[in-house]
Amino acid sequence: MDIERTKQFYRDLKRSNLCDCAYCRNYVNEVAKAYPAVTAYLQTLGVDIAKPFETMPLELDEAGRMPYIGPQYLVFGEEEGFAAATVRDVNDVEVRLAQSHPGDNIQEPHFVIEIEPIFLPWTVEETKAKQ
């Protein structure tokens, strides 16, 4: 893993380059507040939790929370040094290598990790999420 290169990538990644759909905006706005331990863990890898590569939302659950099944993040360098982990937070969150992900057109060594499960309040007012 190249933690410094990963940090640089996330520092340079502007919010305007992220998906602007309501589901992604909700994720970006809420995830760090809802999951401080996961946020801190991802920071040790150089990853900014509020800048996901992919979010994968479902539909609101009975409690009015939006479940995200496997939000994904880019990590630079080789997979060597990365180990799957369980982070204790609001709920236990698994951090692991993604088995599939969208294409990214990045030409330098990197890999994709995913975290799950994530449950967030729905706070994007102008749009009602599906229940």
Each PLM stretch: what is its role?
Residues 98-131:
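Glycine-rich, aromatic-bearing surface loops/beta-hairpins
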Residues 26, 78-82, 118:
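Generic structural motif
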Residues 52-110:
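Amphipathic protein-protein interaction modules
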Residues 41-49, 79:
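Hydrophobic, Leu/Ile/Phe/Ala-enriched alpha-helical segments that form helix-helix packing faces
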Residues 20, 51-52:
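A structural signal for short, well-ordered beta-strand segments and their strand-loop junctions
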Residues 47-50, 57, 124:
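Mitochondrial intermembrane space
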Residues 1-44:
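N-terminal cysteine/histidine-rich coordination modules
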Residues 22, 76, 114-116:
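Residues in well-ordered beta-strands of folded domains
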